[in-house]
């Protein structure tokens, strides 16, 4: 009877440990620190309620203020990433001891392996998805820009030659929140980019830790803009994802299996 009781208690302790891990309520984490490494711009909010790069906002201030944002690899000289060979990184730290690293895109990332199979590199995947999206507007824009009924392969070559990918490589990070293993962040962009060739509805591209994020279609009206020709920062693209289970949980499951196996052997 005593041996049976000990066996029950040992098994119960493993189950209780697992239960505590899986059923612990998610807690919203507070961002405690935010630092940028590399070329960047900070856009604060001016007295008119619009974004302004002439600001005394810190990186943390910008991420905690509605409408403000941090542009990675950004410059006022042109609308492309400053450095396509070296990524600008934004590191956010939280009071749950977790860290998220946001990165501008580089030539190595565009030319690197694609998340999906069937593509030689990420640039091919991104362009294929954008071209075939009914919401991006890319096909009509490219055809209007070229002046003829251009096909996808020719358009892709043109994008590569004209370095259009650079224009999507300097993401504006507006906010970052974390609740347990759930992460949500906003990219600031155009509500509807439009020029003489047509309109585009596409977010910029950002890497978070080892994952790449982007979107096509309508942005959410941010209520602010940068007062430039294309009304930058007037749209928001929101992304949410779940961080995979930590290795500690897998280790705990393995320990539970080992305990059970050991006890089975002891009974023989």
Regions found by a protein language model. Give the residues of each.
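Short, threonine-centered small-residue motifs that mark membrane-proximal processing/anchoring sites
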Residues: 1-30, 231-262
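Short, charged juxtamembrane terminal tails flanking transmembrane helices
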Residues: 264-268
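Helix-boundary and membrane-interface capping/anchor signal
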Residues: 29-242
């Amino acid at each position: 009877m005593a041996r049976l009781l000990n066996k029950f208690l040992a098994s119960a302790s493993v189950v209780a440990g697992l239960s505590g891990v899986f059923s612990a309520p998610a807690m919203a984490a507070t961002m405690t620190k935010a630092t940028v490494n590399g070329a960047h711009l900070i856009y604060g909010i001016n007295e008119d309620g619009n974004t302004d790069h002439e600001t005394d906002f810190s990186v943390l201030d910008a991420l905690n203020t509605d409408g403000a944002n941090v542009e990675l690899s950004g410059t006022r000289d042109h609308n492309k990433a400053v450095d396509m060979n070296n990524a600008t990184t934004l590191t956010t730290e939280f009071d749950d001891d977790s860290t998220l690293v946001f990165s501008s895109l580089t030539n190595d990332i565009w030319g690197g392996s694609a998340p999906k199979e069937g593509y030689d590199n990420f640039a091919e995947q991104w362009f294929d998805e954008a071209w075939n999206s009914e919401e991006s507007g890319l096909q009509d824009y490219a055809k209007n820009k070229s002046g003829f009924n251009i096909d996808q392969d020719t358009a892709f070559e043109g994008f590569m030659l004209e370095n259009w990918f650079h224009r999507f490589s300097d993401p504006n990070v507006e906010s970052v929140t974390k609740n347990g293993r759930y992460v949500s962040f906003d990219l600031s962009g155009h509500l509807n980019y439009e020029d003489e060739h047509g309109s585009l509805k596409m977010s910029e591209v950002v890497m978070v830790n080892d994952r790449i994020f982007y979107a096509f279609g309508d942005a959410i009206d941010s209520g602010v803009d940068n007062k430039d020709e294309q009304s930058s920062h007037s749209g928001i693209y929101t992304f949410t994802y779940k961080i995979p289970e930590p290795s500690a949980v897998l280790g705990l499951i393995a320990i539970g299996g080992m305990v059970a196996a050991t006890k089975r052997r002891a009974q023989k």
